Amino acid sequence: MRKVAIYGKGGIGKSTTTQNTVAGLAEMGMKVMVVGCDPKADSTRLLLGGLQQKTVLDTLREEGEEVELEDIIKEGYRQTRCTESGGPEPGVGCAGRGIITSVNLLEQLGAYDKEWGLDYVFYDVLGDVVCGGFAMPIRDGKAEEIYIVCSGEMMAMYAANNICKGILKYADAGGVRLGGLICNSRKVDNEQAMIEELARKIGTQMIHFVPRDNFVQRAEINRKTVIDYDPTHGQADEYRALARKIHENKMFVIPKPLEIEELESLLIDFGIAN
């Protein structure tokens, strides 16, 4: 079973990218579990046809200790197994702590057991690695390969670089490696070349460039992944390509994060900053 975590700046399109990629893997016949590690609990909605599933933490709050696996895992598109860790009540407690509680519970209840025949588990993780809870999939060896969703926007690249610092910190202890950058295009000038260069400097690859297409939003409004909504659309092929590249990927590295000056000079070289 391959254990994959998807990181990236808040709002970059991690959940959308994760679900569309998982749909591509499921279409290839892979058995995938998606663990949403975001208090918004929107990491599985498209795979479940718009169903906002009850989170692990909400279930724990209501049911107490008497939680069964079927209470917190729902089956989605092509038998994908979907669960959401959820978060504390707004203004109370720590969301990162919630992820730790949820993943530990999933393990105790046997969600990862061989009987499920899982080929992949995907962790869709909130934003930047700024707190220990969100770093948990990296830190505790829950995830072994990381993909960072970014774009040619400065803050997305800054976040990607920060996440690399988190991977570097835990690479020796947890055995986690960076599998590549996924460029979720924002139609920034020279975007593809810039992310390829950023990847090269960090010591990794841009595993795929996902072009911007409003069809993704149309599929989302219809509560589906692109592959589910219209398998013949060109954007569906982009996610299939990304799924295939992840499936065939052999390049797993300990990243070399850039100093802020190097990152800024990259932006200047590509005409984003002056």
From Swiss-Prot:
* Gene Ontology BP term (one): nitrogen fixation
- Single annotated GO MF: nitrogenase activity
Q: Does the keyword Metal-binding apply?
A: yes
The cofactor note reads: Binds 1 [4Fe-4S] cluster per dimer.
The positions annotated for binding [4Fe-4S] cluster are 94, 131
Which Enzyme Commission numbers does its entry carry? 1.18.6.1
Name the needed cofactors. [4Fe-4S] cluster
What keywords does the record list, in alphabetical order?
4Fe-4S, ADP-ribosylation, ATP-binding, Iron, Iron-sulfur, Metal-binding, Nitrogen fixation, Nucleotide-binding, Oxidoreductase
> What the entry says about post-translational processing?
The reversible ADP-ribosylation of Arg-97 inactivates the nitrogenase reductase and regulates nitrogenase activity.
The record's catalysed reaction(s) read: N2 + 8 reduced [2Fe-2S]-[ferredoxin] + 16 ATP + 16 H2O = H2 + 8 oxidized [2Fe-2S]-[ferredoxin] + 2 NH4(+) + 16 ADP + 16 phosphate + 6 H(+)
- Top EC class for this record: oxidoreductase
- Pfam families, from UniProt? Fer4_NifH (PF00142)
Function as written in the Swiss-Prot or TrEMBL entry: The key enzymatic reactions in nitrogen fixation are catalyzed by the nitrogenase complex, which has 2 components: the iron protein and the molybdenum-iron protein.
The record's subunit annotation is: Homodimer.
- Similarity comment: Belongs to the NifH/BchL/ChlL family.
Q: What is this protein called?
A: Nitrogenase iron protein
Q: What is the lineage of its organism?
A: Bacteria, Pseudomonadati, Chlorobiota, Chlorobiia, Chlorobiales
